């Protein structure tokens, strides 16, 4: 695949602790499209140091709307969709060069390694995500606190990894998780139980999910082998599920605050 046919697309909001490391792995790109949600830290200053970057300002409403606005700004056949803390490995970049997508392939999934303070963990709960896709066959839709990419066509699987390496302070993570879990709770409450996945059915039980995720991360995913970093990650995931449980309990006691809309 000719790398000039790929445009990286990134969403940003106060991502100064992460941006440089992400952009340094995108120097091969002829153009990088960034949709910024009115950052107030050094994000825009960092972006200005990279001549390939073209930044568009858009007030954030939903993840899907933000991503779809970004799709409209891309003029190449392929889009590489990245969060500001997603760092491409050299192996994945080399893999792009040798891709020869058949016409029925509309996108490719990539696997992730979650990093704690810069070190990749052996096992995490991050699922593969479709990050490389044809612009003409793709659109985003909202799904809970995040978004889903709908692609018209078949998908392939990349061998290389992306490192999810967020260096923003814990206070920012806590703020984001609370916002996410408010939205996630509304999604769980508004979706009929029969339509929920097994994981979401467990989450809807409130008290069970936090302990399930702790055991899953430490034992089944091998977090204990990562030492204190593995424990840190497992506690993060447990805390996020505890937040969700608290919001679900609050909804039971005060349902008027969780009406659809």
Label each PLM-derived region with a short phrase.
Residues 25, 36-45, 49, 60, ...:
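A conserved acidic beta->alpha catalytic loop
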Residues 9-28:
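Short, well-formed alpha-helical segments that are part of the catalytic scaffolds
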Residues 44-75:
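Conserved donor nucleotide-binding strand/loop of the catalytic core
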Residues 17-20, 41-49, 91-92:
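Acidic helix N-cap motif at the loop->helix transition within catalytic regions
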Residues 79:
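Short aromatic/hydrophobic "clamp" motif used to bind/position activated sugar donors
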Residues 65-71, 89-255, 261:
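Catalytic-site signature of metal-activated, phosphate-bearing donor transferases
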Residues 5-7:
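Cell-envelope/extracellular polymer assembly enzymes that use nucleotide-activated donors
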């Amino acid at each position: 695949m000719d790398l000039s046919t790929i445009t990286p697309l990134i969403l940003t909001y106060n991502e100064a602790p992460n941006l440089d490391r992400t952009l340094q792995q995108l120097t091969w790109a002829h153009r990088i499209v960034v949709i910024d949600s009115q950052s107030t830290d050094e994000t825009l200053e960092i972006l200005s140091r990279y001549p390939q970057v073209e930044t568009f300002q858009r007030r954030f409403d939903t993840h899907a709307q933000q991503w779809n606005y970004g799709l409209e700004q891309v003029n190449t056949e392929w889009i590489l969709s990245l969060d500001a803390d997603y760092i491409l490995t050299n192996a994945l970049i080399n893999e792009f060069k040798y891709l020869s997508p058949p016409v029925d392939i509309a996108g490719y999934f990539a696997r992730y390694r979650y990093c704690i303070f810069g070190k990749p963990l052996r096992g995490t709960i991050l699922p593969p995500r479709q990050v490389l896709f044809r612009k003409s066959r793709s659109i985003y839709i909202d799904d809970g606190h995040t978004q889903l990419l709908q692609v018209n066509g078949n998908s392939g699987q990349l061998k290389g990894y992306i490192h999810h390496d967020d260096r923003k302070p814990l206070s920012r993570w806590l703020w984001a998780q609370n916002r996410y879990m408010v939205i996630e709770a509304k999604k769980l409450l508004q979706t009929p139980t029969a339509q929920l996945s097994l994981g979401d059915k467990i989450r809807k039980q409130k008290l069970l999910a936090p302990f399930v995720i702790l055991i899953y991360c430490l034992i089944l995913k091998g977090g204990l082998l990562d030492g204190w970093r593995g424990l840190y990650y497992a506690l993060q995931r447990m805390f996020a599920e505890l937040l969700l449980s608290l919001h679900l309990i609050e909804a039971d006691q005060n349902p008027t605050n969780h009406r659809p809309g």
